[in-house]
Amino acid sequence: MYSVTKQIEFCYGHRLLDYDGVCRYPHGHNAVVEIEMRAESLDSRGMVVDFIDIKRAIKAWIDRELDHRMILRHDDPLAKVLQEMGEPVYVLDSNPTAERIAKLMFDVSREHGLPVSKVTLWETPSSWATYVG
């Protein structure tokens, strides 16, 4: 089994509803997402996936949808306020936890046809969540 991994950095803000810790308040992270791709064999170029292809697909999506945006739960009253102000917001069906954002990145990678096997999202250098498909 072969694997390659691409790291992408981005910034986002969020808060968690129905949560009694400090993360219930709006705050931000300098995140790092690590996307691992696997394949039993290499393509005609001798690669699992070209790093440039990952960058073109996933980094472009992150830059367009998540970077420097608030990521909020669909029923968060703050989402409506920010949207009415013309501020960029990305809305999830659930709380925007590191676990949910890792799963989102896994799904987006799959939608782009990449052979993703694992996504890890670091909120901080000492706190991360991983989704394995």
PLM segments and residue spans:
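Charge-rich, low-complexity N-terminal segments
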Residues: M1-G133
